[in-house]
Amino acid sequence: MSGRGKGGKGLGKGGAKRHRKVLRDNIQGITKPAIRRLARRGGVKRISNTIYEETRGVLKTFLENVIRDAVTYTEHARRKTVTAMDVVYALKRQGRTLYGFGG
């Protein structure tokens, strides 16, 4: 074995690489009505027009940080699939404990 633990991972030449579409500007998929619904849930009555782009920016930054931490946990465990627990631990690390998803 090559010191990789269980399974013979890392052996062979590897398969063909698939082309993956480059994702750009997907933050616009967070629509104005979706942001409005989130604000309503938070108790907001009126929403300024400038809020939508600002909210998208803040959400993008937040998700980048959480996903970066979750992927770090995944890589440390030598897995290729990010689990719900990886996200829970990533949120806990940032001081935002989330209950109800195991652990």
Curated annotation (Swiss-Prot):
Keywords: Chromosome, DNA-binding, Nucleosome core, Nucleus. Residues 17-21 bind DNA. Residues 1-20 are annotated as: Disordered. Gene3D superfamilies: Histone, subunit A. GO terms for molecular function: DNA binding; protein heterodimerization activity; structural constituent of chromatin. PROSITE patterns: HISTONE_H4. The keyword Repeat does not apply. Residues 1-14 have a biased composition (Gly residues). Pfam families: CENP-T_C. The keyword Nucleus applies. Core component of nucleosome. Nucleosomes wrap and compact DNA into chromatin, limiting DNA accessibility to the cellular machineries which require DNA as a template. Histones thereby play a central role in transcription regulation, DNA repair, DNA replication and chromosomal stability. DNA accessibility is regulated via a complex set of post-translational modifications of histones, also called histone code, and nucleosome remodeling. The nucleosome is a histone octamer containing two molecules each of H2A, H2B, H3 and H4 assembled in one H3-H4 heterotetramer and two H2A-H2B heterodimers. The octamer wraps approximately 147 bp of DNA. Belongs to the histone H4 family. The sequence of H41 is shown. This is Histone H4.
